[in-house]
Regions:
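Active-site and donor-binding regions of nucleotide-sugar-utilizing enzymes
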Residues: 1-100
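A donor-sugar binding/catalytic signature common to diverse glycosyltransferases
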Residues: 33-34, 41, 56, 82, ...
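A nucleotide-sugar donor-handling region in carbohydrate enzymes
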Residues: 78-154, 303
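Short acidic-hydrophobic, aromatic-tinged amphipathic segments that line or gate anion-handling sites
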Residues: 84, 104-106, 201-203, 255-260
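Donor-nucleotide binding loops and adjacent catalytic segments primarily
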Residues: 120-216
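Catalytic binding pocket for nucleotide-activated donors in carbohydrate/polymer assembly enzymes
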Residues: 229-274, 279
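C-terminal amphipathic helix plus adjacent low-complexity
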Residues: 272-309
Length: 309
């Protein structure tokens, strides 16, 4: 089925109801929320109305091309405890009126998870995926940009045009997420699969397989947050296309570009010359333990003051 804007409202309403029912049954002391998708906005609303304090992970970031940007900042204002993954994001949360005493940068859970993930060998990936990985690998994901309506078709066509111009690469696409215009992107990908060899498409690879491919990939390309947040762990060369991640901190292994063919080609010619050795700015020690300990021991106060700068 085609995804429509009305579906977002329906899922948001459903999320509020489900969270409300869980709160009635479980009676939690705190609601922990990670990220900025519309589904969890419903959980934040239900928790706020039920007077349950909220601990929010990944606040303070910017994604100026997506609805997620406004959702993220809204959840920040609902929340009483904050875990940004970078000091720049911490500063932005303070700008939103949150008390610095409630904001803690312990690093990113994603970066920590990758550091602890058992990466699969190339031979194992070949068996699982039934693909002979005997050429350079390009890992690609392209999502709809929710604040750029009716543009997804042209945007994915430009990416496909660029990838079609390359030879001697294995291109592995993962599915776009469940947003408006997802079907437009999938339709173009299906056409591409039929035209060019060594193109593969997976609805979902799972975390371990995806991370393992990312480590050995020659290039990651698209507009997924994983390209910005996760590739620095391996220093994998990455092209971030368009505005979906615009505003996020960009590591030296990543280059931004516009949607058109020439911009993507220019970015490719630049990024292939860069070194892979870069530190992950979101990686710190004992991130999960520090977050969990703070959530358990923090003194929550539902009566929040606005912190003026």
């Amino acid at each position: 089925k085609n995804f429509k804007d009305s579906n977002v409202s329906n899922y948001l309403i459903k999320s509020i109801k489900i969270t409300r029912d869980v709160i009635k049954k479980v009676k939690p002391d705190v609601c922990v929320i990670l990220g900025d998708r519309y589904e969890i906005l419903g959980s934040a609303i239900a928790s706020m109305i039920s007077r349950i304090p909220i601990a929010h992970i990944h606040g303070g970031e910017l994604t100026l091309g997506a609805l997620d940007d406004s959702i993220r900042h809204s959840i920040t204002k609902f929340s009483h405890l904050h875990f940004p993954i970078h000091d720049q994001y911490k500063k932005r949360i303070i700008q939103l009126g949150e008390n610095p005493k409630s904001i803690f940068n312990f690093g990113g859970l994603g970066a920590h998870s990758i550091s602890k993930t058992k990466v699969l060998k190339k031979e194992d990936l070949e068996k699982i995926l039934k693909i002979k990985l005997n050429q350079k690998i390009i890992l690609a994901t392209f999502h709809p940009v929710t604040l750029e309506k009716y543009q997804s078709g042209n945007q994915i066509k430009n990416l496909i045009k660029f990838l079609n111009s390359l030879n001697n690469y294995i291109i592995i696409f993962t599915s776009p997420n469940f947003d408006n215009e997802t079907q437009v992107i999938k339709k173009e990908l299906i056409k591409f699969l039929k035209k060019k060899k060594n193109i593969y498409y997976f609805d979902s690879l799972g975390s371990q397989i995806y991370i393992s491919l990312m480590k050995i990939a020659y290039l990651v390309i698209g507009n997924s947050s994983s390209g910005v947040l996760e590739t620095p762990s391996f220093g994998t060369k990455t092209i971030n296309i368009g505005n979906r991640q615009h505003g996020r901190i960009i590591s030296p292994n990543i280059i931004n570009c516009d949607y058109d063919f020439n911009s993507i080609k220019k970015a490719f010619n630049k990024i292939i010359k860069r070194s892979k050795k870069v530190p992950n700015p979101f990686l710190k020690k004992n991130t999960p333990n520090k977050i969990a300990k703070k959530i358990l021991n923090f003194k929550y106060d539902l009566k929040k003051n606005f912190y003026d700068i």
